[in-house]
C-alpha cells in the first residue's frame, strides 16, 4: 500500500507539468509601500474557486479533519485551535498571505504516512496566524508534530511588514521534517517556480530560521560532509537539473529581468551550461514595482528574451499563440525535445496578486486581486481580506471540473480563452481591451472606495466590512457579465475564420439591413512563407 501511494505521488509530479509560480515584492521595493506576492496555481483539470473559512471560536477538545488539498483524500484528524481567523482565498483578516510551489526533491524524503499535507499547512496557517512569522511557527510545528506527507515545497509567507520564503521536506521513513525560512529584504524582490531556491544558508545577510536537524539529517544520510557554513539546501535536497533550471528557474529569471538586467544569469536559466553562475535568491530592482507591474509579470511569455514564445515560429500555429501544448517534452524520431514553460500558461486554475498595506486598517489594507484562469486571460478582481461572502461567480453551486456553468468565472473565462488561444494574434487584442478596461476601472476606483470604507470603519466596523464585501462581489459579477459579452462578441466577430467589420462600436450592416460583407484575412505573411517552404510547389497555381 505504501509503495502504491508513493508511486501515485511521483506520477502526479511527473504529469503536473511543473505547476505554480510565486513572485514576491518587499515593502521598500514597491511604489506605495505595499508588501506584495503572487500565485499561479497551475495544474491540468484543476477547478478551485475562492475558498472561505469563517472566523470562529471552537469548543475545547474540538478536532478538525485533515484532507489532502490535491486529491481530497481523508488523511486524519488533529486538535482544533481555540480561535481561528477569517480566511478568503489565500489571505486572512490580518493580511497574512501564503502561497506555494512544489519542487519535489529527493524521492526518499517523501513520507506518505505523514499526517498533514502542504495545502492543509497553508490554510491552517492562515486560520491560526496574525503574522508571517507566526505562520512559519504554526506550519512547522504542525509538520513536526504530525509528519509531513507532501513532497518538497517552497512557501511564500507575507504580511504587511515582512516577506519570507520557506522550504520544507519530509525525512522519509523516520517521519520527521526539515525546513528553512529566509526573510526577503524589504528593498528586494524574489520568486520561486517549482525549483528549490534556497542555496548556501549561511550566505544570506538577513534573518534565517531553520529546523534543528536541517544539516544533521543531511549528514546522517551521507548527502553532506562539508562544514556547516557551506551547507547548500537545494544542492543537498533538490539539486537543479536541466528541467529545474529551464522550466522553472527561468520563470523567476524572466521576472527579475523585467526589473534589472539579468543577462549575467541567462546561462543558468537556459539550463545547458552546468558551470553557469547560479541565480540569486533575491535582487534589488532598478525601479520600484507597482501593482500593475506585478500583474503584468504574471502574464509573461518570455517576451523580448532568447526564450520568447511569442515569435512567429511554427510552434505558435497560424496566429502566433504564445502557448504550447503539453507534456513539456516530446520525442521525434528517437530524440527528445521540449517546449518552454512561461509564467502565463493555459493550465492555471486560479491566480492572484496579493497587496498588503500596513498603514490602513487591516481589513481595508489587504486585497487579493483574484482570477479563475490564466493571468493573461483574466481581469484581476479586488477581494478584500475581511470579506466573508464570496462572489457567486467564484463559488458557484453545481459547477465543477466536469460541469460547465455560465454563472461560473472559471468556465466563462476558459470559454473565452479557449476561443482565443488558437487565433491569438487575431482575437487577443479584443480580450485585452476588455481586461485592461476592467482592471483600470478597479484601480482608479480603489482610493475612493477605501476612503469611504475608512470613514465607515471609524464609526461602524461591521458596516465598513459589509461595504467592501458588497463592492468586491459587485465587481466580480460585473467582470463575469463583461466576459459573457466578450464571448458572444468573439464568436460573432471572428466566426468561420473571417472578421466582421465594425463601425462606431457596432457590426456594420448593408443599407438593406443584413450583415456587411466579411473580411477574409487568410494566413499571416510569416506563416504563409513557412507553409510554402514546407509544401513547395504542391499548391502553386499553374500559369495559364
Residue locations for each model-derived region?
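A contiguous strand-loop segment
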Residues: 20-118, 138-289
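Short, well-ordered beta-strand elements within core beta-sheets of diverse protein domains
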Residues: 122-128
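Glycine-rich, aromatic-lined ligand/substrate-binding cores of catalytic
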Residues: 219-368
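Substrate-recognition/cap regions that form aromatic- and gly/pro-loop-enriched pockets
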Residues: 318-455
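Histidine-centered catalytic/metal-binding microenvironments
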Residues: 435-544
Amino acid at each position: 500500500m505504501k509503495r502504491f501511494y508513493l508511486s501515485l505521488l511521483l506520477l502526479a509530479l511527473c504529469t503536473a507539468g511543473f505547476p505554480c509560480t510565486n513572485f514576491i515584492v518587499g515593502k521598500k521595493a514597491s511604489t506605495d509601500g505595499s508588501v506584495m506576492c503572487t500565485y499561479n496555481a497551475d495544474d491540468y483539470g484543476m477547478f478551485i474557486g475562492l475558498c472561505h473559512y469563517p472566523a470562529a471560536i471552537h469548543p475545547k477538545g474540538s478536532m478538525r479533519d485533515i484532507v489532502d488539498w490535491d486529491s481530497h483524500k481523508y488523511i486524519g484528524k488533529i486538535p482544533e485551535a481555540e480561535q481561528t481567523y477569517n480566511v478568503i482565498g489565500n489571505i486572512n483578516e490580518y493580511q497574512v498571505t501564503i502561497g506555494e510551489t512544489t519542487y519535489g526533491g529527493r524521492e526518499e524524503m517523501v513520507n506518505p504516512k505523514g499526517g498533514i499535507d502542504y495545502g492543509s499547512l497553508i490554510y491552517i496557517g492562515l486560520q491560526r496566524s496574525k503574522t508571517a512569522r507566526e505562520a512559519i511557527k504554526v506550519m512547522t510545528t504542525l509538520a513536526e508534530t504530525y509528519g509531513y506527507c507532501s513532497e518538497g515545497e517552497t512557501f511564500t509567507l507575507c504580511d504587511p511588514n515582512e516577506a519570507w520564503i520557506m522550504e520544507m521536506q519530509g525525512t522519509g521513513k523516520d517521519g520527521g521534517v526539515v525546513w528553512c525560512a529566509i526573510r526577503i529584504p524589504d528593498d528586494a524582490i524574489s520568486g520561486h517556480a517549482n525549483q528549490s531556491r534556497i542555496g548556501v544558508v549561511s550566505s544570506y545577510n538577513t534573518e534565517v530560521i531553520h529546523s534543528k536537524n536541517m544539516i544533521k539529517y543531511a549528514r546522517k544520510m551521507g548527502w553532506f560532509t562539508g562544514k556547516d557554513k557551506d551547507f547548500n539546501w537545494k544542492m543537498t535536497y533538490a539539486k537543479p537539473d536541466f528541467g529545474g533550471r529551464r522550466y522553472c528557474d527561468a520563470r523567476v529569471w524572466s521576472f527579475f529581468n523585467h526589473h534589472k538586467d539579468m543577462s549575467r544569469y541567462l546561462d543558468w536559466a537556459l539550463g545547458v551550461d552546468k558551470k553557469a553562475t547560479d541565480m540569486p535568491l533575491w535582487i534589488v530592482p532598478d525601479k520600484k514595482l507597482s501593482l500593475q507591474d506585478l500583474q503584468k509579470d504574471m502574464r509573461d511569455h518570455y517576451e523580448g528574451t532568447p526564450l520568447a514564445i511569442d515569435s512567429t515560429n511554427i510552434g505558435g500555429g497560424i496566429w502566433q499563440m504564445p502557448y504550447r501544448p503539453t507534456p513539456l517534452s516530446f520525442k521525434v524520431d528517437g530524440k527528445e525535445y521540449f517546449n518552454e514553460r512561461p509564467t502565463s500558461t493555459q493550465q492555471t486554475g486560479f491566480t492572484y496578486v496579493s497587496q498588503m498595506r500596513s498603514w490602513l486598517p487591516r481589513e481595508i489594507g489587504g486585497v487579493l486581486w483574484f482570477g479563475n484562469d490564466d493571468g493573461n486571460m483574466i481581469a484581476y478582481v479586488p477581494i478584500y481580506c475581511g470579506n466573508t461572502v464570496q462572489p457567486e461567480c467564484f463559488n458557484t453551486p453545481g459547477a465543477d471540473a466536469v460541469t460547465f456553468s455560465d454563472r461560473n468565472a472559471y468556465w466563462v473565462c476558459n470559454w473565452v480563452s479557449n476561443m482565443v488561444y488558437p487565433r491569438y494574434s487575431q482575437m487577443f487584442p479584443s480580450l485585452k481591451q476588455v481586461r485592461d478596461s476592467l482592471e483600470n476601472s478597479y484601480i482608479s476606483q480603489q482610493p475612493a472606495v477605501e476612503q469611504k470604507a475608512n470613514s465607515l470603519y471609524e464609526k461602524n466596523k461591521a458596516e465598513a466590512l459589509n461595504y467592501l464585501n458588497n463592492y468586491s462581489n459587485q465587481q466580480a459579477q460585473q467582470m463575469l457579465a463583461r466576459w459573457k459579452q466578450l464571448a458572444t462578441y468573439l464568436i460573432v466577430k471572428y466566426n468561420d475564420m473571417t472578421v466582421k467589420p465594425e463601425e462606431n462600436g457596432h457590426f456594420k450592416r448593408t443599407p438593406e439591413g443584413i450583415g456587411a460583407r466579411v473580411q477574409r484575412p487568410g494566413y499571416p505573411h510569416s506563416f504563409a512563407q513557412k507553409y510554402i517552404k514546407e509544401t513547395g510547389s504542391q499548391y502553386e497555381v499553374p500559369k495559364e
